[in-house]
């Protein structure tokens, strides 16, 4: 018998959010070779985070929704805003450990997009520092 089970996180993965700024906890940052391309070898830096609450209103309606996105060594400039949101001053020639973001919180604008014919949540590299005056407010 092919028996499977789902975690709460698995079930939340398919939940579409209303486009907005969300407070997100960075769960993991990885590193893996990207698929071969005509541009040559590159490295992906996959990031997984979890929505905590709306970054403007504190609403927790989408609490627990996981988000996945990538940085790539061929377009690493997209990581500048990510690092800046943590207060890092990004300078040419300086090395940064993306993994140091694990466990930290950031505000991310989450959009909706269509991928392979279905609606998905999309992180399009819009980041800002956490606004400490905004805290979680339980959904009514």
Predicted regions: what is each one?
Residues 1-140:
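Short beta-rich binding modules
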